[in-house]
Amino acid sequence: MRYSLRQDIAVEPVIAGWYGWSYLLPPQTLARFVHNRFNRIVESYLDDPQVHAAAVRQRRMHGGPWIHAHEHRDAIEAWYRETAPRRERLDELFEAVRRLEEDILPRHHGECLDPVYQELPAALAGRVEVFYGRDNRTADYRFVEPLMYASEYYDESWQQVRFRPVTEDAREFALTTPMLEYGPEQLLVDVPLNSPLLDAVFRGGLTGTELDDLAARFGLDGERAARFASYFEPTPAASEAPAPASSSEEDVLEYVGHACVFARHRGTTFLVDPVLSYSGYPGGAENRFTFADLPERIDHLLITHNHQDHMLFETLLRIRHRVGRVLVPKSTNASLVDPGLGGILRRLGFTDVVEVDDLETLSCGSAEVVALPFLGEHGDLRIRSKTGWLIRFGERSVLFAADSTNISPTMYTKVAEVIGPVDTVFIGMESIGAAASWIYGPLYGEPLDRRTDQSRRLNGSNFPQAREIVDALEPDEVYVYAMGLEPWMGVVMAVDYDESHPAIVDSDLLVRHVQDKGGTAERLHLRRTLRL
């Protein structure tokens, strides 16, 4: 008898006690989130958990700084007090960056910066470069990111996973609640997120002895080992197992939820912005694409940008053992707001990661991939690591524009002059996004005033902007996606649409615009098989 992980078991990444995502992996950004956001959330909660309880009961408050576990105050307080000594090292790194930004660099206005290296706090000495901007007066810096990962501040013992059953499609918002064991059905395991042990969990096909050995290597025994074993089920023999929905060798283009699209072309497989749902529980949406539908091999994994709903660690870890090469946009900043995606993914256990620059072309098996410029949706911050992926499947070209915003009206006209017409366009139209501080606030040197923050929202394209993209690229098919409509996206998003919401109005207008011109258009939801 062999055993594999049940399809209804989530394995959630945990970093420093919080739901793991990309800005929590580099130590310099983790320190900012812990100091500027997480500590404040916990202390507010401990002061008055009923305020948090009242907030999370209101749908419009989801996504705010509220803990979704008001009945577990004692457990959260105990965890917070016990981990305080471990947070001291992150506090040290936070203070070092604060001193550099607020005390050291502002004293220099054009003269040689060599003396700065002698002033650097120990946490940053030998790990940053300082320089001037082109005005020759504003001093700035960048991290030497590999040295930050090699430092004592990058501590893999902060990393865990939490096993728990999923009972419905809808997921509770996870980014503001400590990831503890809140019930006997949950299990926290100490393990680096890049550990091959996790690949063994997700690959499955384990004998009983191998399953016992895996529990032991996770440091589990007794009741905890038995709980771990309960997350696995007998694996059907190969002749009895149902074939995954994507196991056919036919060419296919399949939307599978939010911004995730699966494609197969002449035997080469692609997955864009992977976020997948679970299965194995009653009441789930019919015909949704789940982990069980994936092929054994994903030749090329493409990520458009570094937001939680496009680069979800929870999905990435579960499919890592299937993935060949990962394509990501190039980052050139090495700053707090723009850590390198390549470095993050390599520390997450991916070995073949390629960083691609604007309009660079790569051969990917039977297809060709081009990285297109991506403007907007990042709060007007200097963030380079974002791209739209154009994939040429033989004679047919498909653009995954993600949340690109057409704030430079002539750019797509100029792009079209280089790449030619595009057959199919996927475009996100969350035209009223969160304020920039919702993601980036903990990374700021000083907080934005509310008026400025609200003016720099993480917006996708509205109707006029999306229309100009479509008119410039002349596609036959246009699909609105990446709207957060699927219930499982609630784990990292907090959208609440009705028919009057600007995103729904804008996307309806775009669909009609394309259809009026004789094209095919649709706002996608859950799953859709398309021609390739």
From Swiss-Prot:
Catalytic activity: 4-amino-L-phenylalanyl-[peptidyl-carrier protein] + AH2 + O2 = (2R)-2-(4-aminophenyl)-L-seryl-[peptidyl-carrier protein] + A + H2O
One Pfam family from the record: CmlA_N
Pathway named in the protein's UniProt entry: Antibiotic biosynthesis
Disulfide cross-links: none
Enzyme class: oxidoreductase
Binding-site residues for Fe cation 2, renumbered to this chain: D309, H310, D403
Cofactor(s) demanded: Fe(2+)
InterPro entries: CmlA_N, Metallo-B-lactamas, RibonucZ/Hydroxyglut_hydro, UPF0173_UPF0282_UlaG_hydrolase
Entry note: cofactor: Contains a dinuclear iron cluster that becomes oxo-bridged (Fe-O-Fe) during O(2) activation.
Recorded superkingdom: Bacteria
GO biological process terms on file: antibiotic biosynthetic process
Keyword rRNA-binding: no
Single GO term (MF): metal ion binding
Residues engaged in binding Fe cation 1: H305, H307, E377, D403
EC number: 1.14.99.65
Keywords, ordered alphabetically: Antibiotic biosynthesis, Iron, Metal-binding, Oxidoreductase
Family: Belongs to the metallo-beta-lactamase superfamily.
Physiological role: Involved in chloramphenicol biosynthesis. Catalyzes the beta-hydroxylation of 4-amino-L-phenylalanine (L-PAPA) covalently bound to CmlP to form L-p-aminophenylserine.
Record's subunit section: Homodimer.
UniProt protein name: 4-amino-L-phenylalanyl-[CmlP-peptidyl-carrier-protein] 3-hydroxylase
Native source species: Streptomyces venezuelae (strain ATCC 10712 / CBS 650.69 / DSM 40230 / JCM 4526 / NBRC 13096 / PD 04745)
